[in-house]
């Protein structure tokens, strides 16, 4: 069993709404005043399309973790010269594995006409930390060159 050279296409609904109408897709441009929200992180039924070169694609029902989680940056309550950061992502909590057989009509020998591939799906979904952020990897806007472009440019006092 192998997932080598196997491609996985996920067909899923993105659980977001614009003015109470469901929308799908990854990118939405919104006019000012538009109400936009996405559902919390949850396990969602999807269709996985398993593909392997020389084999017929096979659509299988599965699950994916889809939804929003809270992330923020704010001034520290105890040390106002520091920022507190938290980044949470909708991720799996445990996984299940399944073996699927793909039909490969162009295979040279009879043995390889049916290829076993492994696929995985989440058992549960939850908001979990995305990963740690090293303080040294965060570049202040002034260093990155964005400070004069932002809406807060004149809000903060410049230090000499």
From Swiss-Prot:
Keyword hit for Disulfide bond: yes
Signal peptide: 1-20
Molecular-function annotations in GO: BMP binding; hormone activity
Disulphide bonds in the chain: 41-90, 55-104, 65-125, 69-127, 87-130
GO CC annotation: extracellular space
This protein's UniProt keywords: Disulfide bond, Hormone, Secreted, Signal
Top-level taxon of the source organism: Eukaryota
Subcellular location: Secreted
Residue span, CTCK domain: 38-131
GO biological process: animal organ morphogenesis; sequestering of BMP from receptor via BMP binding
Protein role: Final heterodimeric neurohormone released at the end of the molting cycle, involved in the sclerotization (tanning) of the insect cuticle, melanization and wing spreading.
Oligomer and partners: Heterodimer of burs and pburs.
Protein name: Bursicon
Lineage of source species: Eukaryota, Metazoa, Ecdysozoa, Arthropoda, Hexapoda
Gene assigned in the entry: burs
């Amino acid at each position: 069993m192998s997932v080598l050279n196997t491609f996985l296409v996920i067909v899923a609904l993105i659980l977001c709404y614009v003015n109470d109408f469901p929308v799908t897709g990854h990118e939405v441009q919104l006019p000012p005043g538009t109400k936009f929200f996405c559902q919390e992180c949850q396990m969602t039924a999807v269709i996985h399309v398993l593909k392997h070169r020389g084999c017929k694609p096979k659509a299988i029902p599965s699950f994916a973790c889809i939804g929003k989680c809270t992330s923020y940056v704010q001034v520290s309550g105890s040390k106002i010269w520091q920022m507190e950061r938290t980044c949470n992502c909708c991720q799996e909590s445990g996984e299940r594995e399944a073996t699927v057989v793909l039909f490969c009509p162009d295979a040279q020998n009879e043995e390889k006409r049916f290829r076993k591939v492994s696929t995985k799906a989440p058992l549960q979904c939850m908001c979990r930390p995305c990963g740690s952020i090293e303080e040294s990897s965060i570049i202040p806007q002034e260093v990155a060159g964005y400070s004069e472009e932002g809406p807060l440019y004149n809000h903060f006092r410049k230090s000499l």
